[in-house]
Amino acid sequence: MFGVTDDYAKIIMKKLFLTLFVAFATAVLLWACSSSNRVVRFPLVGASNTRMLVFEKVELTDTATVLTVRGFNDPEHWIKVSPSIHLVAQNKEYELIGSKGVEPGKELFMPEDGDSCFTLIFEPLPNACSEFDFIDADAKNGWRMYGIDLTGKMDVANPTGLPRELKYTSKEASDTPEYAYTFGETTVNIHLMGYREGCVTDMVFPVNSMFEGQRSIDVEIDPATGTGSVTFMQYGTGCAFPVVNGCGYGQFFIAPNETVDLYVNLAYINQTLQYNYENYKNLAIKGCWTKGSVYDALNNQDSEDVIVLPDSLLIEEFIRYDMTADEFTGALIDFYRAVCEHAHAQKSGSWAKEICKADAFNTCLIFLNQDFRRW
């Protein structure tokens, strides 16, 4: 009797072993297939010289690298994909071999919403590739997008190059220093995080102050290091805006007589563009940080506390050229109320909400005191 039971147990063990072996082999096979065929949605971009493109999807197979691209411009304007555009990964170039929805070398005119979608097909990238660059080197101002991440591990809140001590600041608005009613020489040392040679064509530095209004300061960036420095006379606390390649990278406050290090996150622009497509994600990342200013705590709020307005809450969505004075005033009030409601609905600190509302109020004042039809 026991002998029969032992034989039966051996049969059961063999069947169990065979089942486990088949399951393991299947898992290995599936893993091998998936390792050579990957899909990355909305990959993060380390640095870019354009705000006309967002990569909606990257598909990596053994035969091709397929990019689903969103292209932007004003309605009835166009963009052009160069036939010489290529990818760069691990110091090797991968050529364009096909396209859908766009013909390389010819204008692609924008629809009424200014948002187009097309597909670019390149030679296959290596399986071990963790990032790649998207380069049009032949055109003078051709697209250059660097460090396109394929791992999903890029730290959007703390980019490479950001000093450790700037990664945490208070969220309490009571820590804000008073307005500085003084004057003196201010120096701002600029560090472009994620910089690659060729990704920055120009940088300007608009500064707003109570006594001088707005003035713009040109910044010369060292092409080898991505750093620069500006010195200027300042009257009272100012609000400054780093503008790289015509795109704003946030704002920060500075006081006269300060020497401040400014860290600009070049990944900011492309990531905020993704906000239009992935509203379920928190893409309200920061554009810049400061070190050495009395306003550091205010300038360096956590990335999740920076409130980015969706396109539906931009001032242009509320006003029209043909409005009467009363209609125009009412539209500005509606704009301010809508922004306040949006700010209060966010899970952000008190600073972020107050700054968001103050920015909206300031926008209303600007439009009330200037003829926006001339803009």
Language-model features and meaning:
Residues 33-161:
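Conserved functional micro-motifs across diverse proteins
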Residues 149-350:
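A non-transmembrane, solvent-exposed segment enriched in polar/low-complexity residues
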